[in-house]
């Protein structure tokens, strides 16, 4: 299947997820984000130039929260959100040199209670307070002093977060 830019999904796929409207989102590492609308049977290419290549260096994770806000990791040291299906990307942190995820490989994004986003990375688990734009490290080292690789996170309740 070809997209609106006459490109198919040809590169490493990082994630496939759905949204509240029944659409399917495919995040590729270096090509684009694709949206498949099952009602219209159309594949739409987002975040790429007219040649079908990604406008950014590399994409990581994408997550739709309960309000259908899209959260995206572009692997440039920042997190982004979009309330209009990736038409507009808003950085969580201002472009003032504060790049708390610079050099990180983000494995999982999970919005949580108290206006926080939980971020699993290859060096641990971090909590981003979206109100005051602060980052708190929750897990970083194991008993032997090695980095903790957090690939998956899930809430059991508002007060209990599981990481693996």
Label each PLM-derived region with a short phrase.
Residues 1-164:
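Carboxylate-rich, polar loop motifs that coordinate divalent cations or form catalytic acidic clusters
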